[in-house]
Amino acid sequence: MEDSDSAAKQLGLAEAAAVAAAAAVAAAAAAAAESEAEEPVLSRDEDSEEDADSEAERETRRVTAVAVMAAESGHMDMGTEALPSPDEAAAAAAFAEVTTVTVANVGSSADNVFTTSVANAASISGHVLSGRTALQIGDSLNTEKATLIVVHTDGSIVETTGLKGPAAPLTPGPQSPPTPLAPGQEKGGTKYNWDPSVYDSELPVRCRNISGTLYKSRLGSGGRGRCIKQGENWYSPTEFEAMAGRASSKDWKRSIRYAGRPLQCLIQDGILNPHAASCTCAACCDDMTLSGPVRLFVPYKRRKKENELPTTPVKKDSPKNITLLPATAATTFTVTPSGQITTSGALTFDRASTVEATAVISESPAQGDVFAGATVQEAGVQPPCRVGHPEPHYPGYQDSCQIAPFPEAALPTSHPKIVLTSLPALAVPPSTPTKAVSPTVVSGLEMSEHRSWLYLEEMVNSLLNTAQQLKTLFEQAKQASSCREAAVTQARMQVDAERKEQSCVNCGREAMSECTGCHKVNYCSTFCQRKDWKDHQHVCGQSASVTVQADDVHVEESVIEKVAV
């Protein structure tokens, strides 16, 4: 009985030690997560090493064993030692018990629930324990990395490196089903990776060193709608920003942060829906008894700049082919868009030929630009003779002249030159191959040439007559312009003189009246006349007396009668 009682007590101590060890594992994971959250800035080498480790471990999908052992130095293993036999366990039952905790990575990223099985591996004589207890470590534990942890029963941790992600406190009991995802939390639905608590109705926010709680149901347009509670007071996002000392920024969406990111990120992912400035709902009016329509904020879409290049590909210019017809062999000039000219075949040009050729340009998408009738020396056209005939000899128009070939120095192959000439009467492409030219055709060409010279002479004469007429008209217009300018100048001088005569003597303005005594001084008003009268009265009286003396009438003595008094 005493052995059984002591074994039962040891069993109770072992179970208590297992629960305490599991709690220590969770506390160690939480401490590691907090240390990583407080120090998000890592060196470049550490980031690269952790990324490499996480990728390698995702591919292998390992299962890591976590061993929780007693404080005795003889059992300080990393989980590789075999479990003790029943006799050894009975001898060491008074000191410690070995418990194995297995943490398995979960393949699905949507289900972040870890289940931990704690099994009593030690055996006591006469009592074999086969019970299993399920523990839930946390819903949001990161599955990227998990390593071996050795925890003593006294709570001290031997190794906690490599465990990433926050962990919730251990909750002994049956395994709970995973928490369903909120709407919009599906994979690929948001731009940023958010914690599930972001879908709560209340969010802890911060602006500089001031923290508050944002209530989504009371969010308005930013300037209106007191949705942030700080202490016992309610503030709108703009007021909360100003209280934190960021009023000059005037951008509460980037000043106020949640989980290290500005609220603009929540708005972009559709988690927060601010109202428009013209909204008249209850939240914007700060009166929950109202029921006005809700107008959501619509972000402004920037227009594309006008100077942006079009998205359609630029059409490349196809090279143009220039064919000289007629010729002995088909010869093609290819003009590339860069301006380079390439030829195919050999050409022989007549430098001194005077054949009346016609340049015809035809628009064809396949062949390009075709010039027909160039001064190309053909096989049927002979060089001019040395007797004195300037015209070349054609087949069927032979005479007794001896045709001498060109000397080698005068051959056009050394300095080739293309001469294109055109006539108004012959600007037609040849429809048939070149045939023998008859004498009537040659005479017709000579007549057409003479007619064209006459036409050019008449045109030059008409141009000369027109130029002479234009010169005469130019001289007449020049004389008329000078006369008009002289008349305008004379009229202007007369007007200026009249203005000077009729100006007020006192102030210089335009005069409206004149002095009734002498009729020589003008005034604009009675005020100027009274002001100038002190000086003018002497001049006005003298001129009147002089006028009277000049008007005296002399009477002869014979006419005067003596009157007795």
Swiss-Prot record:
GO molecular function: DNA-binding transcription factor activity, RNA polymerase II-specific; DNA-binding transcription repressor activity, RNA polymerase II-specific; RNA polymerase II transcription regulatory region sequence-specific DNA binding; zinc ion binding
Pfam families, alphabetized: SAND (PF01342), zf-MYND (PF01753)
Residue list for modification Phosphoserine: S176, S443, S448
InterPro entries per the UniProt record, alphabetical: SAND-like_dom_sf, SAND_dom, TF_DEAF-1, Znf_MYND
Entries under PROSITE patterns matching the protein: SAND, ZF_MYND_1, ZF_MYND_2
Keyword Chloroplast: no
Positions annotated to bind Zn(2+) 1: C504, C507, C524, C528
UniProt keyword list: Developmental protein, DNA-binding, Metal-binding, Neurogenesis, Nucleus, Phosphoprotein, Secreted, Transcription, Transcription regulation, Zinc, Zinc-finger
Gene3D superfamilies linked to this entry: 6.10.140.2220, SAND domain-like
Gene Ontology CC annotations of this record: cytoplasm; extracellular region; nucleus; RNA polymerase II transcription regulator complex
Disordered: region residues: 29-62, 162-189
Zinc finger residue ranges, MYND-type: 504-540
UniProt PTM: May be phosphorylated by DNA-PK complex in a DNA independent manner (in vitro).
One record GO biological process: negative regulation of DNA-templated transcription
Modification sites for Phosphothreonine: T171, T179, T432
UniProt-annotated stretches for the region Interaction with LMO4: 403-478
Start and end residues of each SAND domain: 193-273
Tissue: Ubiquitous. Detected in brain, spleen, adrenal, lung, skeletal muscle, liver, kidney, and in developing germ cells in testis. In pituitary, restricted to hormone-secreting cell types.
Chief location bin: nucleus
Function: Transcription factor that binds to sequence with multiple copies of 5'-TTC[CG]G-3' present in its own promoter and that of the HNRPA2B1 gene. Down-regulates transcription of these genes. Binds to the retinoic acid response element (RARE) 5'-AGGGTTCACCGAAAGTTCA-3'. Activates the proenkephalin gene independently of promoter binding, probably through protein-protein interaction. When secreted, behaves as an inhibitor of cell proliferation, by arresting cells in the G0 or G1 phase. Regulates epithelial cell proliferation and side-branching in the mammary gland.
UniProt subunit comment: Homodimer. Interacts with LMO4; LMO4 blocks export from nucleus. Interacts with LMO2 and CLIM2. May interact with the corepressors NCOR1 and NCRO2. Identified in a complex with XRCC5 and XRCC6. Interacts (via the SAND domain) with the DNA-PK complex subunit XRCC6; the interaction is direct and may be inhibited by DNA-binding.
Record's protein name: Deformed epidermal autoregulatory factor 1 homolog
Gene: Deaf1
